[in-house]
């Protein structure tokens, strides 16, 4: 899904300020309605676990506003990734530009898998744990392993090599 273009830097900067004390990461500099107060947290959380802020009848993702205000660079055609996968953590140190593919590398594994580790599943026919990884939308076989942890370690090594800082590493 392509993100909505943001209003101008001047417009956003006149109303919002980045704040480490606000749960959303933004405070009101100049409220746009009577419910809002100067220096109070700006934004509301939605079911999908992202912070949003209302501005000129438009719902904006707070992490995109923060990145734009801090870096003052056009982000209309890029994805902003939460490094720690916590979409509520809008600290500027937790936000980075990424491609859609890089963002997919930084996600946890599927919840309905036969393994609790990303990139690992059980092969019924071989009775071994299989490690695999996606590269350029193609599944790449890493190997078969006697135990789940060894397969997870093999996945981690491949993920670090292939995805670098965007790799999601299993906790083993």
Predicted regions and their residues:
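Beta-sandwich strand segments
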Residues: 166-169
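Short, solvent-exposed beta-strand edge segments and adjacent coil->beta transition regions
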Residues: 48-50, 137-140
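A short, exposed loop/beta-hairpin motif centered on an aromatic-Gly-Thr core
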Residues: 138-148
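Short coil/turn linker and secondary-structure boundary residues
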Residues: 4-7, 98, 146
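Short helix-coil boundary/hinge micro-motifs
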Residues: 1-51, 55
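A short, charged, amphipathic alpha-helix used as a generic interaction element across diverse proteins
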Residues: 146-162
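Short, cationic Gly/His-enriched loop motifs
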Residues: 31, 56-139, 160, 171
């Amino acid at each position: 899904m392509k993100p909505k273009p943001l209003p101008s830097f001047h417009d956003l900067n006149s109303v919002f300020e980045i704040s480490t004390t606000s749960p959303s990461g933004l405070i009101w500099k100049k409220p746009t309605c009577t419910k809002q107060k100067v220096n109070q947290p700006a934004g509301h959380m939605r079911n999908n676990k992202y912070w949003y802020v209302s501005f000129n009848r438009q719902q904006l993702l707070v992490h995109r506003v923060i990145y734009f205000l801090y870096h003052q660079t056009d982000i209309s055609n890029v994805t902003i990734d939460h490094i720690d996968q916590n979409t509520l953590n809008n600290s500027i140190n937790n936000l980075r530009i990424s491609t859609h593919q890089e963002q997919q590398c930084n996600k946890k594994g599927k919840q309905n898998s036969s393994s609790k580790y990303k990139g690992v599943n059980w092969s019924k026919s071989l009775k071994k744990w299989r490690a695999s990884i996606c590269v350029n939308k193609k599944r790449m076989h890493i190997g078969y392993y006697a135990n789940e942890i060894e397969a997870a370690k093999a996945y981690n090594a491949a993920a670090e090599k292939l995805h670098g800082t965007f790799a999601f590493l299993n906790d083993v």
